[in-house]
C-alpha cells in the first residue's frame, strides 16, 4: 500500500511517502495507525495520539473503523482548521 504523510506527521516519520506491505491482520484504519506506531521511534512519535490524525483512503476521508480492503493508498495528516 502506498502511504503518504503530510505536515508534522511527515516531519516525525521522516519520509513524504513510502510503499509498505501491510500485515494481513491489519484490516482497518485504526489498526494501521497502531501498526505504524510500532515501526520505530519516529512513527511512534507521529502516531502517539492516533485519534487526532486524519486519514484518507484513496483520497476519501476515512474513520478508524474503515476497512483497508481494496484501498491502494492511505494519506495521514493532522487536523485542519478553516478560516
Language-model-derived ranges and their functions:
Residues 1-82:
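Ubiquitin-like/PB1-type beta-grasp interaction modules and other compact soluble beta-rich domains
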Amino acid at each position: 500500500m502506498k502511504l503518504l504523510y503530510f505536515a508534522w506527521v511527515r516531519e516525525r516519520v521522516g519520509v513524504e511517502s513510502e510503499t509498505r506491505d501491510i500485515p494481513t491482520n491489519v484490516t482497518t484504519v485504526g489498526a494501521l495507525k497502531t501498526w505504524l506506531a510500532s515501526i520505530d521511534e519516529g512513527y511512534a512519535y507521529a502516531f502517539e495520539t492516533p485519534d487526532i490524525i486524519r486519514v484518507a483512503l484513496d483520497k476519501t476521508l476515512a474513520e478508524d473503523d474503515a476497512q483497508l480492503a481494496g484501498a491502494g493508498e492511505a494519506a495521514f495528516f493532522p487536523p485542519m482548521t478553516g478560516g
